[in-house]
Each structure stands twice: as C-alpha cells, then as structure tokens.
Amino acid sequence: MIPYFLLSILGLIVVYSTTSATLIEEGKSAFQLVRNQGIFWIASLILIALIYKLKLGFLRNGRLIFIVMIVEMVLLALARLVGTPVNGAYGWISVGPVTIQPAEYLKIIIIWYLAHRFSKQQDEIAVYDFQVLTQNQWLPRAFNDWRFVLLVLIGSLGIFPDLGNATILVLVALIMYTVSGIAYRWFSTILALLAGSSMLVLSVIRFVGVEKFSQIPVFGYVAKRFSAFFNPFNDLAGAGHQLANSYYAMVNGGWFGLGLGNSIEKRGYLPEAHTDFVFSIVIEEFGFVGASMILALLFFLILRIILVGIRAKDPFNSMVAIGVGGMILVQVFVNIGGISGLIPSTGVTFPFLSQGGNSLLVLSVAIAFVLNIDASEKRAKLIREYEGQTSVTL
C-alpha cells in the first residue's frame, strides 16, 4: 500500500501543478480539478477498505460476470449515443457533476472475465492443439472468450473511436491468455497475427496516405494520431502540435528539471498537459532523474503485484493479480510510447499521475483485489501449514 499512497499523493501534486495556472487564467479556482481528484481518491480509499474485507468467492459466479458485462455493454452504447465528445472521441457519460468513462472499467472486467473462464479450463487449454481446437465443441466454451474480446475491442475502436483503451485491452487479453496455460504454439501464433496485423495497418495507412484514410468517418480521429506519429513537425499548427510540444517539454527538463510548478509547456503550449501528456510535464519539472525515480516506484508496485500472482496457488487469484500488474505495465508503456513518439499517441492516461477520477477508481479497485488476494493466499498458506503440522503430530 505504501507505493500506492506515495503515487496517489504525488498524483494530486502533479494535477495541481499542471492545472492551476490554466484555471487561474480562466478565472476559476486553482484547486478545482485537484479537489475533484481528491474526492475520487477518498472514494477510492473507501472502496479499497470495503473490497479488502470482502470474501471474493462471489467473483467466481458466472452469472454475476455475465450481468456485469451486459451492464458494461449498455454503458458503452450509451456513451456513444448520448455521451459527450472529447477531442473527437466519444466515451464519456455525464451524470450531473460526475463523468463516467465505461471503457476504463472494461479493463478490470476483462481481467475478471478471463480469469474466471481460464481458471476453470487450464488443463484443456494446455493440451489441445490447433487442429483439435478448430474441430472440437470445446472451442466455443473457451476460445469464444477470445472472439468476444476481439468483438469488444473492434467495437470500442470503431464506435468511439478509442484507440488507447482498445490497445490496452488487446495486450491485457494477450497477457491473460499467456498466464492461462495456453500451449506455446498457440501463444506464438496469436502474437504473430497481432504483430503482422499491426504492421499491415501501418503499411496501408502509409501507402494510402493519412489524408485519404482520414476521410473514412470512423477513422478520422485515428488518422490524425497517425499523421502526428509519422512526422509531427510537418504540421506544427495541427496534428503534430501536441507531440512536438511534448518533445520540447522533455528537452526543457534536462537531467534535473525546471522545478515543481515551473513548466513552460503547460501554460497553453501543450494540450492535455494534465491527462495524456502529463508525464512530459513531469519530465520538464522533475527532470529525467526525478521521472526515473517515479518510474522506479511505479515498477516496484507492478513487481509486487505480479509476485502476488506468481506465488498464488489458486489459478483464479494468480491470473487476476498478474492481469492487474500487466494492465498497469501496459498502460505505462503505451503512454510513454505515445508522448515520446515511439508509437502513435492513443490518449491513454499515465497511471496515478494523470487527472481523471475514472482511471484512479479503476486502478484502486484493481489494487484492492490484489490486496485481498494476497491476504487470502497467506491465510490459506497458514491453514495448510497448520494442517500439515497436525497430521505429523497425529
């Protein structure tokens, strides 16, 4: 919990630093967004306390998972039909002063869903080969999960479009399949298909041209991201403006940064400085040394979560914990890849540091599940040791 508290408090500081100047210029309170973030953090702490005390056996109920996923699908549909567009993408539902982003919650639901399915079918997954899987009735029972995940991902990308969360969902699902005990040849086949598909899409976009690709109604928003990725300096006043200023922010920071609150780029130059590109401002203010220390703390948290999964004896617990660790790890790499130009910018927030109550709630709930799993596994270990000692005595 210590890394979680440190990162959450640091997140509040960063949110204030990246938003206060702009809010003051707009005639608003400098504490408006950090206050909202603080409210979500308090709600997150309450959820963590409640989830930690629960017995998580009910999570293995297939009917409950089905109901939750139906509710999620309804929320996703509502987000597209009546949601508020942000930067060309739909995915937010406004309920009074609160804004709900259903796609954020889909990440933890996918982990829960796949952990439940594969924890019940590990033996079958490990022994079936490609030929049997394509002919046997077992396929719809387990690998229908993969089809369902793909359907959700394609729908998310095509309907909103939400390239960032779609990318995270693909990679998290891949991690879940990896830890499920799937045969290596199946894993390598899926990985090769994903890599090949990604290269094909990039090649087609490059060959056809971003301008023509952007004329497709569904992919206009995505095309702008790819345009900036290929060469942000070709359109500094348009699609490349955000990425180019991200570069400037990181260069300004140098080794030790300009100091907390002294960022230049956050003062109207770098759009979304408090969300997608918050880590660029972190580098500008704390420098590469300070940013590296923050990453080290975050990776320490991820490692602890993954170790809980590795040590867990229960397959369901193991896959949930590793899935949560993988989710945070993927989100970090996708965000840093986007702000540094290694991959197209996808609108993914940086864990704990970006302003966004939905993201913080999802991270907190996920960590609460891991804390509960860790405690239950330790209790189970003590029971096994006690029973072992009792049997030896008898």
Predicted regions and their residues:
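Hydrophobic alpha-helical transmembrane segments
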Residues: 39-47, 285-305
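Interfacial segments of multi-pass membrane proteins
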Residues: 167-186, 264-287, 347-361
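Alpha-helical transmembrane segments of multi-pass membrane proteins
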Residues: 41-44, 105-115, 169-173, 296-299, ...
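Loop-to-helix entry and N-terminal half of a specific, functionally important transmembrane alpha helix
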Residues: 307-346, 353
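Membrane-helix boundary/helix-loop-helix interface segments in multi-pass membrane proteins
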Residues: 1, 7, 13-160, 336, ...
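Hydrophobic alpha-helical segments of polytopic membrane proteins
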Residues: 64-67, 147-155, 163-214
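Hydrophobic, glycine- and aromatic-enriched re-entrant/interface helices and adjoining loop segments
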Residues: 86, 191-288
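Structural signal for the C-terminal ends of transmembrane alpha-helices
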Residues: 46-57, 114-123, 174-183, 300-309, ...
